[in-house]
Regions:
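Catalytic cores of RNA-modifying enzymes
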Residues: 1-17, 105-108
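N-terminal first-folded block
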Residues: 8-43
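Solvent-exposed alpha-helical segments within well-ordered globular domains of core cellular machineries
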Residues: 11, 31, 53-57, 79, ...
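Short active-site oxyanion
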Residues: 19-20, 38-40, 63-67, 86-87
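Short beta->alpha linker loops
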Residues: 27-28, 47, 72, 95
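Short, solvent-exposed amphipathic alpha-helical segments in soluble enzyme
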Residues: 38, 56-61, 105-106
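Feature captures the catalytic cores and cofactor-binding loops of soluble hydro-lyases/lyases
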Residues: 47-82
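Helix-rich interaction surfaces within compact, conserved domain-sized segments
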Residues: 72-123
Length: 124
């Protein structure tokens, strides 16, 4: 079941990237945050704490109730986007973000959610 949920989530992420609704990379995510509220922040579970904190706290400074998905590894995120690894991503607010968040919540029922330990103020 977990594998199917992961495939569903990575499929949505790939579709979102093709539609132009997803931004990848630290600098691009930082720039996108300064322009518009994100639908969902993507952070690799095995990414460095420093970069993850910078992205999260910038988002929190600009917007309230920022949502983050952190249960996927950099390799799993990379598979979704046709890359070797992805550490930082942002799903722009809209239908893809809502569908991605729902798919992530379903997957999170089978996996640990490390973002809850990274940032205690994250929605549970």
């Amino acid at each position: 079941v977990e594998t199917l949920l992961l495939q569903r989530l990575t499929g949505l992420l790939g579709m979102g990237k093709k539609a132009g609704d997803i931004v990848l990379g630290f600098d691009q995510v930082r720039d996108a945050l300064q322009k518009k509220r994100p639908g969902l922040l993507l952070e690799a579970a095995d990414g460095a704490e420093d970069g993850r904190s910078k992205v999260y706290f910038l988002a929190k400074a600009l917007y309230s109730n920022v949502k983050m998905a952190g249960a996927l590894s950099s390799e799993e995120l990379g598979v979704a986007f046709g890359r070797e690894r992805v550490i930082h991503g942002l799903v722009r607010k809209g239908p893809i973000a809502k569908a991605t968040e729902l798919a992530y919540q379903r997957l999170a029922g089978f996996r640990a959610r490390p973002e809850l330990d990274w940032f205690p103020d994250q929605d549970r």
